[in-house]
Amino acid sequence: RAALMMGGKTVDEIYWWKGKGFDTLAGRKTLPSVAALNAAIAAQIDKARPAYATPAQCVAHSAKIMHGDGKSVGDYAFQRPEGAASIYRASPDFDHSILGAATAVINEMDLGQGEATDVISVGLSATDYIGHAFGTEGLEMCIQMSELDRSLGEFFDVLDGEGIDYV
């Protein structure tokens, strides 16, 4: 949805999440760098993942709150059991993958390296998925914000390192 809304009908490249990797419009080829990223994601997404370390600023937000059918929110650190790819989108790993795809497209297409202005629109959606799944005040959202900040910092470091201006 975000890709189509930001890109419109005439884009050079467009990608969105589809199950276990990034997909594009029917009849278009996926860039080799995005295909390689998809292969890397597919190799990891069904594997067990340990919990994220709890950042110091998030300790106070960790409070298990029980709700229907023995389920809880407020203390989940995004550990995933083997075979749990379906919960990938509602984790910091998702936004990290989106920024990885953006970096792959920038590098493969040499965006920001020519005379013409290049535009890349990146829609990060994990915060929305996490908010709907767990709420906005618990450990889950605090870890997401911390990891999103780290991932964006890494992304901007790449752009800065390549001399690419951005807004």
Regions found by a protein language model. Give the residues of each.
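His/Asp/Glu-rich, glycine-adjacent segments
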Residues: R1-A116, S125-H132
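Metal-dependent active-site segment of extracytoplasmic phospho-/sulfohydrolases and closely related
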Residues: S146-V167
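Residue-level recognition of well-ordered secondary-structure positions
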Residues: T103, S121-G123, G153
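Loop/turn elements at helix/coil->beta-strand transitions in domains of secreted/extracellular proteins
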Residues: Q113-I120, G163-V167
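Aromatic-residue detector
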Residues: D110, G114, D118, E140-M141, ...
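Active-site-proximal segments of metal-dependent phosphoesterases and phosphodiesterases across multiple
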Residues: T136-D149
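Short, surface-exposed, charged/polar-biased interaction segments
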Residues: G123, M141-I143, Y166
